[in-house]
Amino acid sequence: MIELITVVTIVAILAAIATPYFRDFILGQRIRAAGYEIVSALIYARSEAIKRNSGVTVAAATGGWQNGWTVTSGAITLSQHEALQGLTMTGPVAGLVYNGNGRLAATISPFGISAANSSAPQRCINVDLSGLPSSQAGSC
């Protein structure tokens, strides 16, 4: 009986120690997934701009990038993305526009993704003038 109590106590102590780190691990995975989601949307927008030979816009939803974003070509909505629950995302205020050749119409500020009250690593998504996005760990 004493052995069982000892094992249960050790398991409880280990669980208490591991829980905060597990939370940060989960948040880190959510941040990474959100980064890949915006990179995927940017690659899609670029390919649509080339395919249509016309401008394609990626813009934040009302209230900012963490509330989602849309990919449009003129008045046609090509794609809509949901809000990022529990994450903060910053990006170019005016959105970004891909020209028909797949290049950006202007330089933009990078996208930043983080979680409040967490030590999980932030994610930074840069888009070069050729229109290709890249994702890396760390702040922008």
Residues covered by each model-derived region:
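Glycine-centered recognition micro-motifs in short, flexible terminal segments and loops
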Residues: 1-12
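N-terminal helix-rich module
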Residues: 13-51, 55-140
